[in-house]
Amino acid sequence: MARYRGSRVKVIRRLGLLPGFTSKSSNKPQNNNKQLSQYGFHLQEKQKLRYNYGISEHELIKYVKSARRKRGNSGDKLLQLLEMRLDTLLYRTGFVPTVASARQLISHGHINVNGKKVDIPGFNCSISDKIVINKEILKSLNDKNNSFSTLNCSHLVLNELNNDLTITVTNLPDIQVLGYSINILLVLEYYSGK
């Protein structure tokens, strides 16, 4: 699947701050003078979700359809599906700055899930999965980033044994605690006809 390779600051200027997309910020103020139509609001929220999680349009459609099939609030189910992706879980631990850098670590084969090497960034983790980061890459990450933090992530537990970092998924993420600036209902309305 094709990923966005263009200027990240232009996207930040257009859509606002997206912490999973980039840690950069725009020096120019966000232009709010444009009047958007109803469709424009829906499209903007959908694009925020896509860029923040680094997924393609086709992947997002599959996640929306899967969330609709599950019982409960479709918006919460959609965010839970996206938050349980392996690249997002690594980003939430705080040792990589963006979801894209987590994708790179995974695709280079530095991550093991339940004792098996996983090189698919969109791998869906489940409760009680153990994610282990290889020792060599952990040392270089420690040099760049002094501390790991699972801020707003009560569903992840970090353990460090024998220079290995183990992340355990204890339960589903609490969507209210994560704090999103994305209106998920507008995204679901955008895909209501599809």
Swiss-Prot record:
- Domain S4 RNA-binding spans what residues? 84-144
BP-aspect Gene Ontology terms:
ribosomal small subunit biogenesis; translation
Instruction: Give the SUPFAM superfamilies listed for this entry.
Output: Alpha-L RNA-binding motif
Please provide the record's keywords in A-Z order: Chloroplast, Plastid, Ribonucleoprotein, Ribosomal protein, RNA-binding, rRNA-binding
- GO CC list: chloroplast; small ribosomal subunit
Pfam families in the cross-refs: Ribosomal_S4, S4
What InterPro entries does this protein map onto? Ribosomal_uS4 (IPR022801), Ribosomal_uS4_bac-type (IPR005709), Ribosomal_uS4_CS (IPR018079), Ribosomal_uS4_N (IPR001912), S4_RNA-bd (IPR002942), S4_RNA-bd_sf (IPR036986)
- Tell me, what is one Gene Ontology molecular-function annotation carried by this entry? structural constituent of ribosome
| Keyword match Isomerase | no
Location of this chain's protein in the cell: Plastid, Chloroplast
Classify the source by domain of life: Eukaryota
Q: Does the keyword Transferase apply?
A: no
Record's NCBIfam families? Answer: PRK05327.1 (NF003717)
Q: What does this protein do?
A: One of the primary rRNA binding proteins, it binds directly to 16S rRNA where it nucleates assembly of the body of the 30S subunit.
The annotated subunit structure for this chain is: Part of the 30S ribosomal subunit. Contacts protein S5. The interaction surface between S4 and S5 is involved in control of translational fidelity.
Protein name per Swiss-Prot or TrEMBL: Small ribosomal subunit protein uS4c
Q: Which organism is it from?
A: Bigelowiella natans
The organism's taxonomic lineage, starting at the top: Eukaryota, Sar, Rhizaria, Cercozoa, Chlorarachniophyceae
Encoding gene per record: rps4
